[in-house]
């Protein structure tokens, strides 16, 4: 089995979408998409040649970084240190050894600093506002509606209301009430 790393993924990408994209190159044994933090995935191909074909075809497509996973070369242990083999680890952003992509100073155009509490700052739906809940854990009471009923009738438009075709109207145009005043025409 050959493991492939896919980086720079949209946080909303699903395992099914990746499977559909990569299965054209060969038999997939496993697809795993990271959720915390999002943005990368690992796929396992049955045959190394299929994995290499997928890498050559899909690397840099859609902005993705697709390459062989380095976990196949010796696993996690053996390197010592606090992270186990950090000296042998290759950064997926810049390609250099000795640090991870989240610590890369050259990746994505700027230095990325970790805040002390990233979970508090980031909403679970990645940027969309969430509704606040009152301190007691309940939602605040619904807003009261206005006591005055909504106005019905003529709008505030300056144009007269639509009355249909003029041919169908029995009213005369010279009087706003549809009949003549007895005082019109000097009577």
Curated annotation (Swiss-Prot):
It is found in: Nucleus speckle. Its main location: nucleus. Extensively phosphorylated on serine residues in the RS domain. Phosphorylated by AFC2. PROSITE patterns: RRM, ZF_CCHC. Keywords: Metal-binding, mRNA processing, mRNA splicing, Nucleus, Phosphoprotein, Spliceosome, Zinc, Zinc-finger. Residues 178-187 have a biased composition (Low complexity). GO terms for biological process: mRNA splicing, via spliceosome. A zinc finger (CCHC-type) spans 89-106. Residues 165-177 have a biased composition (Basic and acidic residues). Residues 68-89, 105-187 are annotated as: Disordered. Residues 2-73 form the RRM domain. Expressed in roots, leaves, flowers and siliques. One of its GO terms (cellular component) is nuclear speck. The modification Phosphoserine is found at residues 123, 132, 134, 140, 146, 159, 181. It holds the Pfam family RRM_1. It comes from the Eukaryota. Residues 107-122, 136-155 have a biased composition (Basic residues). SUPFAM superfamilies: Retrovirus zinc finger-like domains, RNA-binding domain, RBD. One of its GO terms (molecular function) is identical protein binding. Component of the spliceosome. Interacts with SNRNP35, AFC2, CYP59, RS2Z33 and RNU1. Interacts with MOS14. Probably involved in intron recognition and spliceosome assembly. This is Serine/arginine-rich splicing factor RSZ21. It comes from Arabidopsis thaliana.
